[in-house]
Regions:
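Long, leucine/valine-rich, helix-dominated scaffolding and oligomerization segments
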Residues: 1-50, 54-58
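Residue-identity detector for glutamine
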Residues: 18, 22, 60, 79-82, ...
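Surface-exposed beta-strand edges and their flanking turn/coil or helix-capping segments
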Residues: 19-20, 48-50, 76-79, 247, ...
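Long, charged N-terminal interaction/targeting segments
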Residues: 48-215
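Cys/His-clustered metal-coordination modules, chiefly Zn-binding fingers
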Residues: 169-282
Length: 282
């Protein structure tokens, strides 16, 4: 059963040798590890994980960069850990990280946007953030949105059933648990610990981060299995998408036999016209 981890700045508190030992133990116990990392190539925690991967010479560790806010990455890791209990293999799970990110709606309630650089901020919002008592509703994924947090002003949400998670400190979460949860028709609202990278990501320590996500493992499984699978021509893992996230092989020649694995069940697959990580365009 593969293991799924979420890369955070807390990983940097570990000595490199200890970090290497932890990942090695996870690989020994689970066979494969899927690590969800920040999208920024210069992120210190992500660079550390690449160092660990190189030290172990581990092609069973997939580092998946995602341009998601910290809470969304944590919840995506939770979703993938649910799916590890199904019959999905490690290559499919790694690709599912990108696929399922389409179904996350993530933002934050902020007391100031003066240092926010993840979402375009207009001059008017910068000026308003200087006024005490102003709260801003910001959506970073899937589409950027910024506005004052008012009962009648709610960013567009998911068009399907989700649960809502929130995490934060320093601000009243009433706008999230009230108008936002009602407008997004959230089935359940729960509070979780604030991820260690949230304050840096959002540019302020006074925030309440929120994410709408699909909690039903059956629905998650259906979404993942609705995408066509292929077999990596190098390592032989079954994957979704146009690249194996473990060995980084691009699946350009879909009909070539795997070099390091047995015949993938004799299936014949047609060459797709586009990558398969865009579920709404299949």
């Amino acid at each position: 059963m593969p293991s799924v981890i979420t890369v955070t700045s807390d990983d940097l508190a570990l000595p490199l040798e200890q970090h290497v030992a932890q990942v090695a133990a996870a690989l020994d116990a689970h066979g494969h590890v899927v690590a969800l990392a920040p999208a920024e190539a210069d992120d210190a925690a992500r660079r550390r994980l690449h160092t660990v991967r190189s030290a172990l010479e581990a092609d069973r560790l997939a580092i998946v960069p995602l341009g998601l806010p910290p809470l969304a990455r944590v919840l995506l890791g939770e979703q993938l850990r649910q799916l590890t209990g199904t019959d999905l293999g490690p290559g499919v799970l790694a690709g599912a990280a990108r696929l399922l990110s389409y179904y996350l709606h993530s933002g934050a309630l902020l007391g100031s946007v003066s240092k926010l650089d993840r979402v375009p901020v207009g001059v008017g919002s910068h000026v308003k953030s200087l006024v005490p008592g102003r709260h801003f509703a910001v959506l970073a994924h899937p589409e950027p949105y910024i506005g004052e947090a008012e009962p009648a002003a709610v960013p567009p949400g998911p068009g399907y059933m989700t649960q809502l998670a929130l995490a934060g400190k320093g601000l009243d979460p009433g706008w999230i648990t009230g108008p936002l949860a009602a407008a997004w028709r959230s089935q359940h609202v729960r509070e979780v610990p604030l991820p260690p990278d949230s304050a840096r990501w959002w540019g302020t320590g006074k925030l309440v981060e929120f994410t709408a996500y699909i909690a039903d493992v059956g629905m998650l499984y259906q979404l993942v299995t609705s995408v066509r699978r292929d077999t990596c021509t190098w390592c032989g893992l079954e994957v979704i998408g146009d690249q194996c996230l473990f060995c980084a092989t691009r699946l350009g020649d879909r009909n070539a036999p795997a070099k390091h694995a047995a015949d993938p069940r004799g299936r014949s697959v047609e060459t797709p016209r586009r990558p398969q990580l865009e579920p709404h365009k299949r």
